[in-house]
Swiss-Prot record:
Keyword Transferase: yes
Name under which the protein is recorded: Bifunctional protein GlmU
One GO BP: UDP-N-acetylglucosamine biosynthetic process
Protein family: In the N-terminal section; belongs to the N-acetylglucosamine-1-phosphate uridyltransferase family. In the C-terminal section; belongs to the transferase hexapeptide repeat family.
Subcellular localization(s) per the UniProt record: Cytoplasm
Free-text cofactor note: Binds 1 Mg(2+) ion per subunit.
Binding site for UDP-N-acetyl-alpha-D-glucosamine: 8-11, 22, 73, 78-79, 137, 151, 166, 224, 330, 348, 363, 374
């Protein structure tokens, strides 16, 4: 049966103490509301209605989605009022799944289970059992059918002993939902329209009300402050670490690993402590990642070793390469098979050929380095004149002496040698030696300055 989703995302989130709408705060590097949208997309929803209010411009600038229906809740008058804003876009003959925008860890299989329950009843609720349900609305059942939700303050002692509580997430037919929304009243202490009132309406009509439950209570936990946000962040990281280790990745300390995107791994990958993975990252077989590294939108091929404290962003590291420690590969950096980048080397829009080496203290920008070339310590490609970027080409088997400056655009031929300390401004032919530095002058018996 066709189904639509209503995501409630209009709240300001006052306790977050932020200018950012609550649902745009990130968990695992992704805004909370975007995580929920991604989940229901994978579930196969026909339509998604996003109810927004506070920070609408920020939401629209961040959540760029096709086929997303934006429903403005100009005044925040309760959850029932929020769903009413989406009602004109809901069809009678479809089921409607209602979710909250600040519970980002809900799993696809949990929502699939809720959908399956709805197929055999009129109203399906997502409930959860808590060890301490104090302050929460209790689920009341009669012959296994849910008949009511009783708020904690109104519950009897027997009802307060019930551990099952309502999460606010539910599914019903469009026709039932719209009818019940039209009957909601704000005759309560808060003067708001509560979505949970539809449960009592359904029960009074003799509707069959059933429930599904998540694998873990953390799936339905919401965020109202920074502490809760941090707790959900850690819960997500623990979940992701468990999945990686189950799939064969060695995490030397799972509690000190952060995945803020997607990570594809081969066999026998080893990741040391304090590694952060952002965006889309792929690691081949037998890759080793040292401590304190940041990997962002990059690909690292089989048998590569990334030493500690290195940063790799939008770069490609070839098979059996070595990077670091303390190296930085910036966007457009490419290392081919068996290449090596050592400590305090930076690459940007540069290709380091097969077997080539830049072992220390080097900047390679807008450069192409041939196979088996050796780049000495302190070498700089001077690629920027203040307006334009220019390219440096270094041929295979070339040797660049330490502390050389290569002023682009410039070409160093195959097998050429550049003497240490040179400033190269023009082409160096194949197999030639280029030396371009000031002549040394020695002054005998030089009197050193003395302090007065």
């Amino acid at each position: 049966m066709a189904f639509s989703v209503v995501v409630l995302a209009a709240g300001k989130g006052t306790r977050m103490k932020s200018s950012l709408p609550k649902v745009l705060h990130k968990v695992g590097g992704v805004p909370m509301v975007q995580r929920i949208i991604n989940t229901v997309r994978s579930l196969g929803a026909d339509n998604i209605h996003l109810v927004y209010g506070h920070g609408g411009d920020q939401l629209k600038a961040t959540v760029v989605e096709e086929n997303l229906n934006w429903c403005l809740q100009a005044e925040q008058l309760g959850t029932g009022h929020a769903v009413q804003q989406a009602a004109p876009h809901i069809n009678d003959d479809e089921d409607v799944l209602i979710l909250v925008g600040d519970a980002p860890l809900i799993r696809e299989d949990t929502l699939s289970a809720l959908k399956a329950v709805k197929e055999s009843c009129d109203l399906a609720l997502l409930t959860v059992n808590l060890d301490d349900p104090t302050g929460m609305g209790r689920i009341i059942r009669e012959n296994d059918n849910i008949t009511a939700i009783v708020e904690h303050k109104d519950a009897t002692e027997a009802q307060r002993a019930i551990k099952e509580i309502n999460t606010g997430m539910m599914m019903m037919s469009g026709a039932d939902l719209k009818r019940w929304l039209g009957e909601l009243s704000n005759d309560n202490a808060q003067g708001e329209y509560y979505l949970t009132d539809v449960i009592a309406m359904a029960a009074s009509e003799g509707k069959r009300i059933q429930s599904a439950q998540p694998q873990s209570a953390v799936e339905v936990e919401g965020v109202n402050n920074r502490l809760q946000l941090a707790n959900l962040e850690r819960a997500l990281q623990n979940r992701q670490a468990d999945e990686l280790m189950t799939n064969g990745v060695t995490l030397l300390d799972p509690s000190r690993f952060d995945l803020r995107g997607t990570l594809q791994t081969g066999n026998d990958v080893i990741i040391d402590v304090n590694v952060i993975v952002e965006g889309d990252v792929t690691l081949g077989n037998n890759v080793e990642i040292g401590a304190n590294c940041i990997l962002r939108n990059c690909t690292i091929a089989d048998n590569a070793v990334i030493e500690a404290n290195s940063i790799i962003e939008e770069a490609r590291v070839g098979e059996a390469c070595t990077v670091g420690p303390y190296a930085r590969l910036r966007p457009g950096a490419v290392m081919q098979k068996n290449a090596k980048v050592g400590n305090f080397v930076e690459m940007k829009k540069a290709v380091l050929g097969e077997g080539a080496k830049a072992n220390h203290l080097t900047y390679l920008g807008d450069a192409e380095v041939g196979a088996k070339a050796n780049i000495g310590a302190g070498t700089i490609t001077c690629n920027y004149d203040g307006v334009n970027k220019s390219k440096t080409v270094i041929g295979e088997n070339a040797f660049i002496g330490s502390n050389s400056s290569l002023v682009a655009p410039v070409n160093i031929g195959k097998g050429a040698t550049v003497g240490a300390g040179s400033v190269i401004t023009s082409t160096v032919d194949e197999a030639a030696l280029a030396v371009a530095r000031g002549k040394q002058r020695n002054i005998p018996n030089w009197p050193r300055p003395t302090k007065k």
